[in-house]
Amino acid sequence: MTIPLTLKQRATGAQPRAMRREGRIPAVLYGHRGTQSLALELEQRTAEDLLKRVTINNTILPLKVERGWSGDVLLREVQHDAVGGKLLHLSFFAVAGHGSITLDLPLVFTGEAVGVKMDGGLLEKVLTQLTVNTPPTDVPEAIEVDISTMQVGDMLYVKDLVLPPGIEVVNTPDLVVAHLTPSPTGRALQSMDAAESAVEQPGEQPATAAG
């Protein structure tokens, strides 16, 4: 996704509260020229429009600083007022010059599980995104998760996922991604079958009195 974004360098001594009263949002760029950070600002309307189009810690976008640096960045953090929800601050991270970056990628489930199609099972998606390390020059939009072979009772773990080349998962390998459970009707039938099996089990015959 290409989202041109131009920010101004923040004036020395500018007070964030005063800026917000004037319709400007303070921001900061990290990873710019090593560990140096750069104080920035942008119009509130521009910031709010940006937040409608990008995902925190996921979308890489081009950023240009007026009369200064330009390059690709991640939107790392968004701060809102805890009471009123007012936008307070944005943090960006420059990805250029880094061998890999850490970000969150959404999971896209593909196929129809056999256990759903044949047995009426219910698929529960436990995980909706993965935290990964990836080269900044080749970031996939999402991680595809093929669920077509899942049967009722199956559980899919992070370690089972097929990842694009160069992607390294940060999440715990044994974290559950999805599992397939019987439908309520299926569970009821299983309970009935179990009860019938218990009744049909041959029990010990009572002893008869001699006489």
Curated annotation (Swiss-Prot):
SUPFAM superfamilies: Ribosomal protein L25-like. GO terms for molecular function: 5S rRNA binding; structural constituent of ribosome. The keyword rRNA-binding applies. Disulfide bonds: none annotated. Residues 186-211 are annotated as: Disordered. One of its GO terms (cellular component) is cytosolic large ribosomal subunit. Belongs to the bacterial ribosomal protein bL25 family. CTC subfamily. This is one of the proteins that binds to the 5S RNA in the ribosome where it forms part of the central protuberance. This is Large ribosomal subunit protein bL25. It comes from Gloeobacter violaceus (strain ATCC 29082 / PCC 7421). The gene is rplY.
